[in-house]
Amino acid sequence: MPEMPEVENVRATLQELVPGKKIDQVIVRVPKMIVSTPPDEFVHMLVGQEIEGVRRRGKFLLFDLTNCTILSHLRMEGKFRLMDENEEVSKHTHIIFHFEDHTELRFLDVRKFGTMEVTNKYGEGETRSIKKLGPEPLTQAFTLTDFATGVKKTSRAIKTALLDQKLVAGVGNIYADEICFEAKVRPERAANSLSDKEIKRIFKATKSIMTEAVALGGSTVRTYVNSQGKLGQYQNKLKVYGKTDEPCVVCGTPIEKIKLNGRGTHFCPNCQK
């Protein structure tokens, strides 16, 4: 699933491509992808609207139109591509926004898990999806004090806590593993067992890793590309995720993989305590 660094890079590339484009037709080929609104109403609300800009909140893309905002979640495999109207439509293209300039923004999703919903303009904060999100890791709202308070409140594994979007928005499986490694903390440690120093290390690692991942275009470990079809580069920086049985870059101990609450989880049994 694309995490915050990947979604931010999708946002940035879309922001270069679609503002100013006016929608004259919307085709919904998989109705279940439209949530909170009947698909025909979704289409009716969008025709005639102009895209003014693209924002992001957590793992959600926010398309600001003339009179409304579209919330889009990529889930596991969702991708946006801007194409000419005459280009072949692939079988994995499920939603098409056709523009007056004869281009199309197409939403492709092999697994059909992606979702879209429409809300009042800038009204995403009132939706169930956005209302529950915690602070972004690269904003001033993400503070050590609040983070430590949240961590100390739960007996869940620290990795599980990092994946809780109410604690910090945008961290997923890849970066949670990398954060725990950088902080030298075992991912299965009970969050409320961590010392203040360990919590501070996790906080700092969250900010530094997410910052670098955004700068490098995210991680392409499966099929992720941005909206211009470019691969991420942070996968070349990963130290534990996907490195099962490879030597730790710090100590040489083989990286181990376990299941933690159903998630494949990678760590160094020597460096992380």
From Swiss-Prot:
Positions bound to DNA: H92, R111
Designated name of the protein: Formamidopyrimidine-DNA glycosylase
GO BP field: base-excision repair
Gene3D superfamilies: 1.10.8.50, MutM-like, N-terminal (3.20.190.10)
Lineage: Bacteria, Bacillati, Bacillota, Bacilli, Bacillales
Cofactor note: Binds 1 zinc ion per subunit.
Gene that encodes the chain: mutM
Species per Swiss-Prot/TrEMBL record: Listeria monocytogenes serovar 1/2a (strain ATCC BAA-679 / EGD-e)
Summary of subunit composition and partner proteins: Monomer.
Cofactor field: Zn(2+)
